[in-house]
Amino acid sequence: MYTLATHYRGAELCVELDEEEARLLINGLVRQCSPLSNTLRLSSTVQTDYEWHEFIEGIITCNAEVIKMVLVANKAEIAEKEFSP
């Protein structure tokens, strides 16, 4: 399993990828999952801080050479990681 996790404004964000599907988790809860494909975009809105909401995206790009995971909050990249398949 491939995982990218970060702490952002009081929320624990995580993108996971295994042989069957990809998942976006926020504070340990699966917010969206999707079957595998070359490019996946998983998203959810989360409350961070008091009455502040963020649009969170997990973007996963897969090809024969590399698996790239990116976490984005309100269109700003907050974490990135590459893996060799």
Locate each region found by the language model.
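Cysteine-centric segments in proteins
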Residues: 1-85
